[in-house]
Amino acid sequence: MARKTPIERYRNIGIMAHIDAGKTTTTERILYYTGVSHKLGEVHDGAATMDWMEQEQERGITITSAATTCFWSGMARQFPEHRINIIDTPGHVDFTIEVERSLRVLDGAVAVFCAVGGVEPQSETVWRQANKYKVPRLAFVNKMDRQGADFLRVVGQIRSRLGANPIPIQIPIGAEENFEGVVDLIKMKAIHWDKSSMGMAFEEKEIPGNLQASCDEYREKMIEAAAEASEELMERYLEEGQLPLDDIVKGLRIRTLNGEIVPALCGSAFKNKGVQAMLDAVLSYMPSPVEVPPIKGVQKDETEGERHASDEEPFAALAFKIASDPYVGNLTFFRVYSGVLSSGDTVYNAASGNRERIGRLLQMHSNSREEIKDVMAGDIAAAVGLKNVTTGDTLCDPNHIILLERMEFPEPVISVAIEPKTKGDQERMSIALGKLAREDPSFRVRTDEESGQTIIAGMGELHLDIIVDRMRREFKVEANVGAPQVAYRETIRRSIEQEGKFVRQSGGRGQYGHVWLKLEPQERGKGYEFVNKIVGGTVPKEFIPAVDKGIKEQTENGVIAGYPVVDIKATLYDGSYHDVDSSEMAFKIAGSMAFKEGVQKANPVLLEPIMKVEVVTPEEYMGDVMGDLNRRRGMVQGMEDSLSGKIIRAEVPLAEMFGYATDLRSATQGRANYTMEFSKYNEAPSNIAGAIIKKSQ
């Protein structure tokens, strides 16, 4: 099938921002002006098209990255029609996984900043993630109509706090309630958008006299930035003192794609000003799939291969999101890097080794969809009903296998017990949690062996709140949730030898199992090891796996406080048996008894998870932040200067970190942010351990 849009005219972009920068309203306006959306959805009244999960509408924050396709030919229809695929990304610290996975499949991004709040902590986190994937960016300073709006101040913060090189290509005309439009520094014209057409129409006027000097100054800086793109442009600029308009755009484009500059624009999405020109900038300065480096992967013969953005190459795509849809069931969102795929084709999942037949293919527009017959290089689409695909899997041509670089997903750090409010909902709850875990690799579900409770684990308190909320809304399962729990472990501090004997001989066939174990502590992270040193058949070899099994089950159930026993070596070195009464069950129980008694005598201790915490804080709050970390039993490992103040690195027990996000926010007026990941297990202090053991008895 012929392409409707040449791949050179594709733009795969993300809209990334801090929570309140106005990202969803900006995306809404994009959909409106590109003719997809005919009613303006406002976050304020919770009707935004992109935010298609009910909860997002309630909380006013964007959680899932919905993928949307739209078309644009420029404000004045000055470009041939381009196809823009937009991925909306969340801006909350608990959803960094969503941001990671969308950045992984984007070619460029528009970073939205609030003209009043400027660069917020979360902007720094998202910016770092975009640096990791080398994503070219534009900056859109939104909310120019708000009190306290200051475009150039925010541009300064992008330079100082994010270490980027922003180049204004517009200057605002007025600010706050007097914000009227923008000056286009390339054409040197003032742009005013028409209120009655909701900004669909605009007119170009002369630059207001009071802005002329400022516009000349920033135009000069912009042209210098463009001239640095190549020797040829620099020579022309030095000879003529000027550059033609086409060369300015060409130079800015080259440097943006190389990640050397960030063109900066401004507007007010809410007031329908500026988004139209920002869309023009997406066409002018963001890359097409052909302009980003080919994607690399591992081929069937273990050598490195790559795929170029071409329909002629073998098919290769990355599944970046799984979502369940109330109408069509399972949706797998994927980005096509090379080749063509038609519905009815078979693909190979290089991660799992399974083959999948492709049924329906959908082009998504936030919450409506259009069925399509095939997808091509550069497309972002969704497949319906794929069975065994998870986030990060590679789908490829079965005859040309390649495994694209996987996304890295963090380990969950917090868990809660969850149970349905009514017994009849148990099965529905299991199905719901299973589906949610497939959608989100940073969310895990397991059953606690001893209590039979269902335990869910995730990246933070808000993350788990939202999971429980989605169960209620999408699966109609009401659940009770326990308090957040820390994943403690148990181990021993000294070696010991211990006998375990299980004898039942009262009429009929009895039970007889008898073992001697040596238990020894192992280094951290070694786990459980079983060694068989039986000589002379004192324990027949058919019963030895049963001893191991009995010990293993006991390690999972814990000894002193019900937490798994780790880093321990159990050596079976002696025992005895009975010709008739010995059985696997008897030896399993004997092994378990010996292990349990031995651990109790071998100076058992409780281990607690220690988190690596990194806090980025303005210097004036450093003392407060460090004092607070010390109160939380934290050990400060080091400090360094950062673009936005100080970075404090510390190791803190997870048990002390609950509620930290809220405390840090209030202690620093929301200006500090932190990241936290698991580091290691350390012995818990005796007063802490004592309280936990007592609670478990």
Swiss-Prot record:
Annotated localization: Cytoplasm
Residue ranges of every copy of the tr-type G domain listed in the record: 8-290
Keyword Protein biosynthesis: yes
Keywords, ordered alphabetically: Cytoplasm, Elongation factor, GTP-binding, Nucleotide-binding, Protein biosynthesis
Major subcellular site: cytoplasm
Keyword Repeat: no
CDD domains the record matches: EF-G, EFG_III, EFG_mtEFG1_IV, EFG_mtEFG_C, EFG_mtEFG_II
UniProt record, GO biological process: ribosome disassembly
Function: Catalyzes the GTP-dependent ribosomal translocation step during translation elongation. During this step, the ribosome changes from the pre-translocational (PRE) to the post-translocational (POST) state as the newly formed A-site-bound peptidyl-tRNA and P-site-bound deacylated tRNA move to the P and E sites, respectively. Catalyzes the coordinated movement of the two tRNA molecules, the mRNA and conformational changes in the ribosome.
Official protein name in the record: Elongation factor G
